[in-house]
């Protein structure tokens, strides 16, 4: 696992964007696994800047998102489809038909999950998977205690995750209780994984991910078993590392 410690969130975002940009330049038809949440927003802004300045071309890129809330349409302003459109896709030349997010309104969730995994397989897998870290160690919506081998599946969100996401909704009661998420098994199949984390609130999980015991109680520790992981964190998130 490669570790890069940056001064602050802004620098972390720039370093992460540069890492992804280099992979896109090397392979214009790259399949990117993308993440949502507060952490990647700065990185996405930097990718948009690079695109606007003619440094990047997304026209042949395919993207696969990790997860989506169950019960929210893609037009809902808290859905992850809406997040991706607003924070990245609407501002670059990616073909929207090549951007995939689980369907939170799928009538048959099990079929949606199986179809999502089949789509990833048909594309030849994910070349570069971007991950944020939940404070409880979740990646995607793979919450503590779940089995590693699971493919894309329906999951119940932990209370800590619901509370962490409540800031994006009018009330905690509006936060969906279920989500569709790529499984840890699917994430681990990515050829390369890039993890980004910022702030003191992520310091414990960053330490566990780097050197803690591998356990499903902290899903991020599973990444120790992947052959090509780069962890990009700011000084606050790295403060417990020796």
Curated annotation (Swiss-Prot):
Pfam families xrefs: Glucosamine_iso
GO terms under biological process: carbohydrate metabolic process; glucosamine catabolic process; N-acetylglucosamine catabolic process; N-acetylneuraminate catabolic process
CDD domains: GlcN6P_deaminase
Gene3D superfamilies linked to this entry: 3.40.50.1360
EC number(s) from the headed UniProt entry: 3.5.99.6
Active site: 67 (proton acceptor), 136 (for ring-opening step), 138 (proton acceptor), 143 (for ring-opening step)
Record bears the keyword Hydrolase: yes
Molecular function as annotated in GO: glucosamine-6-phosphate deaminase activity; identical protein binding
Keywords: Carbohydrate metabolism, Hydrolase
Record field: catalytic activity: alpha-D-glucosamine 6-phosphate + H2O = beta-D-fructose 6-phosphate + NH4(+)
SUPFAM superfamilies, alphabetized: NagB/RpiA/CoA transferase-like
Enzyme class (EC, first level): hydrolase
GO CC annotations, alphabetized: cytoplasm
Pathway linked to the protein: Amino-sugar metabolism; N-acetylneuraminate degradation; D-fructose 6-phosphate from N-acetylneuraminate: step 5/5
Family per similarity comment: Belongs to the glucosamine/galactosamine-6-phosphate isomerase family. NagB subfamily.
Entry function: Catalyzes the reversible isomerization-deamination of glucosamine 6-phosphate (GlcN6P) to form fructose 6-phosphate (Fru6P) and ammonium ion.
Name of this chain's protein: Glucosamine-6-phosphate deaminase
Chain's gene name: nagB
């Amino acid at each position: 696992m490669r570790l890069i410690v940056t001064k602050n969130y802004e620098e972390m975002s720039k370093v992460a964007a540069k890492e992804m940009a280099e992979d896109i330049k090397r392979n214009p038809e790259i399949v990117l696994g993308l993440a949502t949440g507060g952490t990647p927003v700065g990185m996405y802004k930097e990718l948009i800047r690079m695109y606007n300045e003619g440094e990047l071309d997304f026209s042949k890129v395919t993207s696969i998102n990790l997860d989506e809330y169950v019960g929210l349409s893609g037009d809902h302003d808290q859905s992850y489809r809406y997040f991706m459109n607003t924070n990245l896709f609407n501002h670059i030349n990616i073909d929207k038909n090549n951007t995939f997010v689980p369907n939170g309104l799928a009538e048959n969730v099990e079929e949606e999950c199986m179809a999502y995994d089949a789509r990833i397989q048909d594309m030849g897998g994910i070349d570069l998977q971007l991950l944020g870290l939940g404070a409880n160690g979740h990646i995607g919506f793979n919450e503590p205690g779940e089995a590693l081998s699971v493919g894309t599946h329906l999951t119940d969100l932990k209370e800590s995750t619901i509370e962490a996401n409540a800031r994006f909704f009018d009330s905690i009661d509006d936060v969906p209780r279920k989500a569709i998420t790529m499984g840890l098994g699917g994430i681990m199949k990515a050829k390369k994984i890039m993890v980004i984390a910022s702030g003191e609130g992520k310091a414990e999980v960053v330490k566990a991910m780097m050197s803690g015991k591998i356990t499903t109680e902290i899903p991020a520790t599973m990444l120790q078993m992947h052959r090509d992981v780069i962890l990009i964190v700011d000084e606050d998130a790295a403060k417990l590392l020796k």
